């Protein structure tokens, strides 16, 4: 009985100090929540973000192929509709973990 009483505080500390499963679970992170999570995960290393490049690609997709480009694309109509795989698609539209966010650290 005395051994049990000595181990009880240790068991309680371990029980209450385990990480919350929600904190480690995959989550939707959008906007400022995504930025805060990146700061948390990356710390002093920082993270990379290239919005201008993304806008250039999106603009090309909106405009579609030019008239002189249509000849080479007759059998490839989805050629210019590329799938995006950025951090917003990965963590906001879908879910991601803190471990996946680490891929965006410098």
Curated annotation (Swiss-Prot):
Disulfide bonds join 30-92, 42-105, 91-96. Residues 56-83 form a propeptide. Residues 1-23 form the signal peptide. The keyword Disulfide bond applies. GO terms for cellular component: extracellular space. GO terms for biological process: glucose metabolic process. InterPro entries: Insulin, Insulin-like, Insulin-like_sf, Insulin_CS, Insulin_family. SMART domains: IlGF. Pfam families: Insulin (PF00049). It is found in: Secreted. CDD domains: IlGF_insulin_like (cd04367). Its main location: secreted. The keyword Magnesium does not apply. Keywords: Carbohydrate metabolism, Cleavage on pair of basic residues, Disulfide bond, Glucose metabolism, Hormone, Secreted, Signal. GO terms for molecular function: hormone activity. Heterodimer of a B chain and an A chain linked by two disulfide bonds. Insulin decreases blood glucose concentration. It increases cell permeability to monosaccharides, amino acids and fatty acids. It accelerates glycolysis, the pentose phosphate cycle, and glycogen synthesis in liver. Belongs to the insulin family. This is Insulin-2. It comes from Xenopus laevis (African clawed frog). The gene is ins-b.
